[in-house]
């Protein structure tokens, strides 16, 4: 499932297995009926999402929807805030900075000693593929794959995938029976709601600024986090980008310097 769906989706331009190749009738391959087409789409496609989108999804007749897009299997990208291992599962709290952290549960095989049963440590950026679930009105993911990011560009790529996938799916679901895309673009309007503000951090900061702020917040030392530590932990960012983020956060009152000009603490720290 992983290789034929999730990875092929990530490495393709929304084509091939797990992709979103558009045809006049909607999804790429012909289908005997609209119901079967939708069922096949839910079963086969893994839809990239933000946590904000997942938390706002509606559940009707055991089907999750974001706007007019049906979802079942999804991917998210975020940072692990907390990890707790039980005998049969691992529960992570994953934060993509679009909403509150989301619970992600990964079931483990007690007889299997492979890396699948290894707890990924907190403060690790990961890509998660799983099934959206709701229990007592609380949404969570049941993961079938959790993979640490090797390159932070994957974070940016995921955001672009979120926009594109929901745009394509919204258009497909908005098409009339004749197969021609409507002139007035409700799909684009929906996609704007999906891919516009929803993937931006809720606090109005950029992804880079949030990464710097979260590292400073997480530092337990009384003197705070020093600039060298920021550089060591944000190797994907240039020194000038880190400095710009620090200067912005300081000017906006999110952080302050402590023992010297190179140590910073969050104003939200307890």
From Swiss-Prot:
What is the name of this protein?
Replication protein A 32 kDa subunit
Q: Which residues carry this modification: Phosphoserine?
A: 4, 8, 23, 29, 33
Q: How is it modified after translation?
A: Differentially phosphorylated throughout the cell cycle, becoming phosphorylated at the G1-S transition and dephosphorylated in late mitosis. Mainly phosphorylated at Ser-23 and Ser-29, by cyclin A-CDK2 and cyclin B-CDK1, respectively during DNA replication and mitosis. Dephosphorylation may require the serine/threonine-protein phosphatase 4. Phosphorylation at Ser-23 and Ser-29 is a prerequisite for further phosphorylation. Becomes hyperphosphorylated on additional residues including Ser-4, Ser-8, Thr-21 and Ser-33 in response to DNA damage.
Give the start-end ranges of region Disordered. Answer: 21-41
Function in brief: As part of the heterotrimeric replication protein A complex (RPA/RP-A), binds and stabilizes single-stranded DNA intermediates that form during DNA replication or upon DNA stress. It prevents their reannealing and in parallel, recruits and activates different proteins and complexes involved in DNA metabolism. Thereby, it plays an essential role both in DNA replication and the cellular response to DNA damage. In the cellular response to DNA damage, the RPA complex controls DNA repair and DNA damage checkpoint activation.
Q: Where in the cell is it found?
A: Nucleus; Nucleus, PML body
Note the Gene3D superfamilies from the entry: Nucleic acid-binding proteins, Winged helix-like DNA-binding domain superfamily/Winged helix DNA-binding domain
Gene for this chain: RPA2
Q: Assembly and partners?
A: Component of the replication protein A complex (RPA/RP-A), a heterotrimeric complex composed of RPA1, RPA2 and RPA3. Interacts with PRPF19; the PRP19-CDC5L complex is recruited to the sites of DNA repair where it ubiquitinates the replication protein A complex (RPA). Interacts with SERTAD3. Interacts with TIPIN. Interacts with TIMELESS. Interacts with PPP4R2; the interaction is direct, DNA damage-dependent and mediates the recruitment of the PP4 catalytic subunit PPP4C. Interacts (hyperphosphorylated) with RAD51.
Please tell me, according to the UniProt entry, what happens when changing residue 29 to D. Answer: No effect on DNA synthesis following DNA damage. No effect on cell-cycle progression, nor DNA synthesis in undamaged cells. Impaired DNA double strand breaks repair. Extended DNA damage-induced G2-M checkpoint
| Outcome of mutating residue 8 to A | Increased RAD51 foci formation and homologous recombination efficiency at DNA double-strand breaks
Q: Upper taxonomic classification of the species?
A: Eukaryota, Metazoa, Chordata, Craniata, Vertebrata
